[in-house]
Amino acid sequence: EVMRSGGGPTVIEAEVYRFFHQNGPYPGSAFGYRTKEEEASWRARDPLELVAKHLVRRNILSADTIESVRKQAVAAAGDAATRLTEPDPDGKPGSRRIRPTLWPDPGFVDVGVRGDLSELTGARTLELSTFDGPAESKRFIDVVAEVMDARLAESDQVVVMGEDIHRLNGGTNGATKGLAKKYPDRVLGTPISENAFAGLGGGIALDGRYRPVVEFMYPDFLWVAADQVFNQIGKARHMFGGESKVPFVLRTKVAMGSGYGSQHLMDPAGIFCTSPGWRVVAASTPFDYIGLLNAALAIDDPVVIIEHVDLYATSGEVPVGDRDYQIPFGKAAVRRAGDDLTILTYLSMVQHSLDAVEQAGVDAEVVDLRWLDRASIDWDTIGRSIEKTNAVMIVEQGAVGTSYGGWLA
C-alpha cells in the first residue's frame, strides 16, 4: 500500500519455510529437528497456496486452471528428469543416474575460467623503456586519480565505489581526488560492508551495463567479502561456461610499515593468484600504473590491481596528457640486466631490489613482473632470465603462509 500510494521504494521482508531437508526429498521432521505440527502450520500459510487462493477468490483463475498448471509443472519436471537420467544399474532400486552420453567432455573442465582476451585486440600499448614522446614527472597517487578521471569521463559505464572514496579529498590516500564532485552519480561512498558492495559490484558487472571499480581500503578486508570475491565474482565466468563476462576491477593497497596493524597491511597477491578466475596486476611506476589500470578496465575478467602505500608519494615519468594507453598484456619489464642472479619482484620491492643489488655489487637481473597470475605472467621472460643466470631470488613482502613467492617458486 505504501508503494501504491506513492510513498516510494519499500523493503518487504517475507519469512518463508524450507519444507525439505538440505538435500533429498525428506522433510526435516524425518530427521528429528522439526515437528510435523510445525511443518503443517507453515504449509497452511505457504505463499504459493495463498496466492492460488487469492487468484481464485478474485476470479482471475479458476481452481481447475490452477490444478492444470500444477500438473503441467510436474509433467515438465518429470520429462526433463527422464531425458537427463536413466535407471542406475549399480544403484539401489529406483535410483537414477545422469545418462553417460550427457556428461561433458573432460576438456571442457576449464572452459570459461577466464576469457580469451579478444577485447584487447588492437589496444594501443606503450612501454617506458621505448617511449620517446614528451614526458612529465608525476606523483604516483596523482596518476591513480587522473587515469580514473579519464575513464569516468570516457564512459558512463564506469562506476567507482568504496569506503570514504567520496570524501577526505579523495579517500584515505587521494586516489579518487576530485572525482566525487565531477561524477557524483558514479563515485559512490559505501557503508563499511565489503561483502555488500563487492557483491553489488559483481552483480552490475555481470549485468553488462557497467564496469565497476571497487576499492577495498585495505586488502585484509577481503576476508569479510570472501564469498563474493572468490566464490561468486571469481567463478562466475566458469559457472556460466564462459558466456557471461565479468568486467570487475578491484583496487587495493599493501600498507606494510604504515603502523595500522596486522589487519591493515597484507599483500594479497598470493591469495588471488591461487584463486580461480582472477587476473592480478601490480605497478611499480606511475607510467605502468596508467597502462595496467587501463588494461584491467578493458579486460572482461575480474582483475585485482594491487598498489602500495610506499609508492604513492614517489614520482616518475609519464606521457604528457596521455592517460589512455595500456601496458602490453602479460609482459614483464626487465629493470636491470645481469648475468649472475635473477630477481623476480613487484611493487615497491622493485626499487628496493635495485638498490640492494647496487649496494651489494651483484650482477643481478631484476624483473618487474607486473602481471602476476598464472594465466597472465610472463613465463618467457622469466625462463630466459633463469636460463642465463641459473639462480633465482623472489623478493616480496607477503606473509609466509599466503606468500606470492611461495606460490611462484
Protein language model regions, located:
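Thiamine diphosphate
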Residues: 1-82, 86, 90-91, 101, 105-302, 306, 310-311, ...
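Low-complexity, intrinsically disordered regions enriched in charged/polar residues
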Residues: 45, 60-63, 67, 92, ...
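Terminal amphipathic helices with adjacent charged low-complexity linkers/tails
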Residues: 71, 75-125
